[in-house]
Regions:
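Histidine-rich, glycine-flanked metal-binding segment
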Residues: 1-54
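Divalent metal-coordination and catalytic microenvironments
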Residues: 9, 22, 27, 49, ...
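C-terminal cap of metal-dependent C-N hydrolases
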Residues: 9, 321-324, 375-442
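Metal-associated gating/positioning segment near the N- to mid-region
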Residues: 47-115
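Short catalytic-loop micro-motif centered on adjacent basic/acidic residues
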Residues: 90-91, 121-124, 231-236
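A glycine-rich helix N-cap at a beta->alpha junction
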Residues: 110-126
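Histidine/acidic residue-rich metal-binding segments in metalloenzymes
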Residues: 132-147, 153-306
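His/Asp/Glu-enriched, well-ordered alpha-helical/loop segment
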Residues: 199-229, 278, 299-306, 311-387
Length: 445
C-alpha cells in the first residue's frame, strides 16, 4: 500500500479549518502538521489550498446487488460513490433476495469483498416472520436493522402492531425505520385517481405520500422507541412537522436520531414540473417550506446525519406513467458536489457538512477509526476543488449502471479531485483506480 503525502491543504475537521499537510502510510493517517518535511512518500499531491475532508460515510444506499444488475451492483455503484466523495457505504436489505437471513448477509459481504472500491457495511432486514433471527443478531456483524413501516420498493412492509412491539422490544442494535403510513397513502391515491383517472401526474406524488402519512408513522416509531428504550434512527425525514419529534441535543445524549437525504435538501415540489418521475422517491420530495425547514434543522442537533438514499432505476422504467414508474433516484456520484452547493450558497458551513456526512455517521453507527482526520485513523480522504465557473454535469460520464442523473442540468461549483479509500487512491483527476479494494466496516458495540 503506497504512502501518500498531501501538501498545502485546507483541512476541515471537528469544527475547524486549518492549513496543513497530511501523511498516509499503510492505509492510515500517520501525521498531520502545518508542514511535513523529510518524508519520501510514494505519491505526493499538492492540494494548492483545496479542502481536505474525511470521506462521506453514507448510511443509506440501495446498490441493487444481488438481483438487479441493470440498475446497479457493488462494482458499478461503489465506483460512482468514490467519484462523489463517498468512501464508505451501508447497503439496504431490500434486494433480491432480501437480506433477511444470515446466509443472504454473508453472500452480500462476499460480493462486496470481490468488487467494491469503497468500504462497505450492511443493514439487516425485518419481515413478518424473521424476528427470531433479528433478535439473535450479533450487533457487530451488521450496520443496523431496517424496518419498513411504510410500503416501498421491495415489498418488505411490517405494519402488524404485535410484530412491531416485539421488534422494538427485542432488536439488539440500532433500528432504522422507513416511516410512512400505508393506509393514508392508499386513501390519498384513491382520491387522486378519482380526480385524474389513469393519468396521475408526478406532481401528485407528495399529495399521495403526504406530510400526514409521514408524521403519523414517524410518531408511532418514536412512541414505540420511547416505550421500549429502543435505539431508533428514523430515515429520510421530509417534513417540517416531523422535526418536533426529535431533540436538539448532542448525539451522545440521544437514543432517537434522524437522517435527512440530499435530494430532500436540494429539490422541492416545484421541480416535478421539469423532472417528473425522475425525482419520484419514497418518501416524496415535498414543499419548499419543508425543504427549508430541513436545511435549518441541520444547523442544530435536531437532524443528525445526511445520507443519499441512492436508489437507481433504469431510464426506461422512469419513463413509464406515474403509477408504473418505480420510486428512487441515483445520487452517489454527485453526493458531495451537490451538497457543496449548500455551502456555496451560505446555507451550511463546510464544518457542519463534514460533521453531518462523516463525523456523526461514524459516531452514530459506532464505526471505529473512520470519519475524522485524526492520526491513527484510516485514511478515508477527499480533496474538494473549487470550480468558480461551475462544472456542467451533462459533460461528465455517468458511472452508475442506470446511466442517468437528476442533476443533468446542474453546474456544480465544487468537484471531487481526489478520493482515498483506506489509504488507497480510488479517484484522482477524473480517473478511477480499479485496483482499489474497499474494506468491511467494523461496528464496535
Amino acid at each position: 500500500m503506497s504512502s501518500v503525502l498531501i501538501r498545502n491543504a485546507r483541512l476541515v475537521n471537528e469544527g475547524r479549518e486549518f492549513d496543513g499537510d497530511l501523511l498516509v502510510s499503510h492505509g492510515r493517517i500517520v501525521k498531520i502538521a502545518s508542514s511535513i518535511e523529510g518524508e519520501n512518500a510514494a505519491i505526493e499531491i499538492d492540494a494548492d489550498g483545496q479542502w481536505l475532508v474525511p470521506g462521506m460515510i453514507d448510511d443509506q444506499v440501495h446498490f441493487r446487488d444481488p438481483g438487479s444488475p441493470a440498475k446497479g451492483s457493488f462494482y458499478s455503484e461503489s465506483r460512482a460513490a468514490v467519484a462523489g466523495g463517498i468512501t464508505s457505504f451501508m447497503d439496504m436489505p431490500n434486494t433480491n433476495p432480501a437480506t433477511l437471513s444470515l446466509a443472504a448477509l454473508t453472500d452480500k459481504k462476499r460480493r462486496a469483498a470481490i468488487s467494491s472500491v469503497a468500504n462497505y457495511g450492511f443493514h439487516f432486514g425485518v419481515s413478518n416472520d424473521n424476528l427470531d433471527i433479528v433478535a439473535a443478531l450479533n450487533p457487530c456483524e451488521v450496520a443496523g436493522v431496517k424496518v419498513f413501516m411504510g410500503a416501498s420498493t421491495g415489498n418488505m412492509l411490517v405494519d402488524d402492531p404485535r410484530i412491531l412491539e416485539r421488534l422494538f422490544a427485542e432488536v439488539p442494535t440500532i433500528l432504522l425505520a422507513h416511516c410512512e403510513h400505508t393506509p393514508s397513502i392508499n386513501a390519498n391515491a384513491m382520491n387522486l385517481r378519482a380526480l385524474f383517472g389513469e393519468h396521475i401526474p408526478a406532481s401528485a406524488h407528495p399529495l399521495i405520500r403526504n406530510a400526514e402519512a409521514c408524521l403519523h408513522s414517524s410518531s408511532m416509531a418514536v412512541d414505540l422507541a420511547k416505550r421500549h428504550g429502543t435505539r431508533l434512527h428514523v430515515l429520510h425525514l421530509t417534513t417540517a412537522r416531523e422535526l418536533a419529534l426529535f431533540e436538539d441535543r448532542p448525539l451522545s445524549q440521544k437514543h432517537i436520531t434522524a437522517e435527512v437525504c440530499l435530494h430532500h435538501l436540494l429539490f422541492d415540489d416545484r421541480d416535478y414540473a421539469s423532472l417528473g418521475n425522475l425525482i419520484k422517491c419514497n418518501p416524496a420530495i415535498k414543499t419548499q417550506a419543508d425543504r427549508d425547514a430541513l436545511r435549518r434543522a441541520l444547523l442544530s442537533d435536531r437532524l443528525d446525519v445526511i445520507g443519499s438514499d441512492h436508489a437507481p432505476h433504469t431510464w426506461d422504467e422512469k419513463q413509464r406513467p406515474y403509477d408504473l414508474a418505480p420510486s428512487g433516484l441515483p445520487l452517489v456520484q454527485h453526493a458531495l458536489p451537490a451538497l457543496l452547493e449548500l455551502v456555496a450558497d451560505d446555507v451550511l458551513p463546510i464544518t457542519t457538512l463534514v460533521a453531518k456526512t462523516s463525523h456523526r455517521v461514524a459516531d452514530l453507527f459506532a464505526i471505529p477509526d473512520r470519519g475524522y482526520l485524526r492520526e491513527g485513523y484510516w485514511a478515508d480522504l477527499v480533496l474538494i476543488k473549487p470550480e468558480p465557473g461551475g462544472v456542467a454535469v451533462s459533460q461528465q460520464p455517468i458511472l452508475s449502471q442506470c446511466g442517468w442523473t437528476p442533476f443533468a442540468r446542474w453546474r456544480f461549483r465544487h468537484s471531487v479531485s481526489t478520493t482515498l479509500v483506506s489509504g488507497q487512491m480510488a479517484w484522482h483527476d477524473q480517473r478511477l483506480n480499479d485496483s482499489c479494494q474497499g474494506l468491511p466496516l467494523r461496528f464496535m458495540r
